[in-house]
Amino acid sequence: MPFHFSKVMKGQHSEFVAAAWLIKQNYLVYNKTQDNDPMDLVAIERVTGDVLKIDVKSVSFRKTWKPGTRICRVPSKYQKQLGVIILYVYPDGRCDFHGKD
């Protein structure tokens, strides 16, 4: 029987994959400290000091209406005020930022 991630486990896995990907992109990565934080990761580019506030999302694909297309997630109003951006994590480990594919 194949292993199946629970929703929480899938989210945690995606956060670790995203952190590893960001480290490879030359970022320092800091994890959230509370369950209901508006962001999952804070990443600081090592050379420029640019700061990214990131909400990590596991990619989901539509099963009906345009099957196979990615479901686009939208930051909440509060996340938008804070400048949080979405980082998608695909099942194969690829990552990309919302709107920057």
Language-model features: where?
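Mixed-charge (Asp/Glu-Lys/Arg
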Residues: 1-38, 42-101
